[in-house]
Amino acid sequence: MAQNTAFFISNTRGKMPSALHGIFSAVQEFSLSMLCSAHCFTIFTQRVYLRRQTGKIYCMNNYLNQLQKTYQNDDDFTTRQVDCGMPLTLCFLDSMCSDIKISNYVVEPLTYGEKATDFECIKKRLTTGAIVKEPANFFDVLDVMSNGYTVIMDEQNCIAVDTRTTLARAIIEPPTSMVMRGPREGFIEDAKTNLTLIRKRLKTADLKVTTLNVGKYTNTTVFVCYLSSIAEKKVVDEVVQQVQKINIDGVLDASYLSRYIDKNKTALFRRVGMTEKPDVAVGKMLEGRVALIVDGSPMVLTVPYLYVEDLQSPGDYYEDNTMTSLNRILRFISVLASVLLPSLYVCLQMYNYQIIPLKFLITVLNSTQAIPFSPLAEMILIIVIFDILREANLRMPSAVGISLSLVGAIVLGDAAVKAGLIGAPAVMIGALSGIGLFTMPDNTLILSLLRLVITYIAGVMGILGVILSMMVILFYLCSMQEYHTPFLAPFTPTMDNDKQDAVLNKSLVSWKKRPKSIPNKNTTRRGQ
């Protein structure tokens, strides 16, 4: 239309009055400018269309400038110029990349042989022996560089080659999960190695992995692993949604993630399983649970989680089922004793001493008659001192920690009894209670807190306070539910099938059904 307007004006200019010549001249100039603009717009749209069709990224010099601005004052950011028939720029983070891999996977393929004529030739050379990605935008470039990739770019294209350095420690037995029999491999801080340890045990295409990134600055990789033929889809979706909703600067360990995927942030008892052993994680996945591998952490999270799992040990499934059952009963009794012994000692001395046999009562009275503190203050003092020694032992080196424990337990205890500050029965009760806590190491802190609270209530209300405290705790545990799983299953609600691996452990030969307390698609264990 602009061409027709200009042609019409040029042909009719001599036939018009002179007064209209100025107006038509202005219109002609406007039409010519519109013609030029239309031509330029056509070129622009053709270039945009070409970019969409070819997928190429133009103006790589702008990307290089943006990288230099982003990593300004960062000596770790490195650029190199390579000429292989066409000028190329290599960009990478020196601390994340291996010089040997850059030489073998990037520089040598580019400079070896004939000169490259185009970028497609460069791609073919680089893809023969390395993992290669093509960033779609500037944010993808930043992401691959942060993961140890080397970005190769010319004026119009870019490609990234995996040259990350390997910083993984040896696979050893976890110090917190040692066993007499069974596998001794443990997870390490590298997420891909941990995923390999799981895949080595689950050689099936049903093992699915969803990759997520968490943390504004750390951009930590999280692998959500599950068996698609066993795990319930609604549980998997809920776990993925909980991880995707996390908004935090950084995730440095799996314990960060456990606080976010636990829906009840104020729960006293943890409701997310944690393990350092691949065989334990695989065993839980075979029951329908979801495992989460966090890069940088040797701990793997598992959900849903049952309280009865605290009584189970990794070595239980490699021992005789009779011995396993006895050990679990012993753990259960130890936990109850560690929580209730101090409170029962206090209430029986202060309020309900008539329940104690006469000879035992006389012995206790002879040991405590010169003590300046009340039984409540005496027991709380012992509990606090024991917790201080335990915390100091954790913070000190192993050799010093052993000496500190011996000095604290023997020297201080003996000196306090001889000085008449505390009684020998109270020291014995406090020691038994403290040792019993370590039969359930994952809940030591919360059990220690409950022990202190119940002891105080026993000193105020007597045996009635102990009974009421245990009822409140039991009701609280019964009300807990996470990811469609009751926390106290298989006892409340009662599930007879699940009791084969609760406190008593039946033979593996009799395990025919998967736990009903864990949502799953396939209830049969025997390959069906």
Positions of predicted regions on the chain:
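Membrane-embedded alpha-helical signal segments
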Residues: 2, 6, 17, 21, ...
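Loop-to-transmembrane-helix entry motif
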Residues: 323-340, 367, 371-375, 407, ...
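Membrane-interfacial loop-to-transmembrane-helix junctions in polytopic alpha-helical membrane proteins
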Residues: 319, 323-326, 367, 393, ...
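Generic detector of multi-pass transmembrane helix bundles and their immediately adjacent loops
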Residues: 344, 360, 369-528
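Membrane-interface interhelical connector segments
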Residues: 350-368
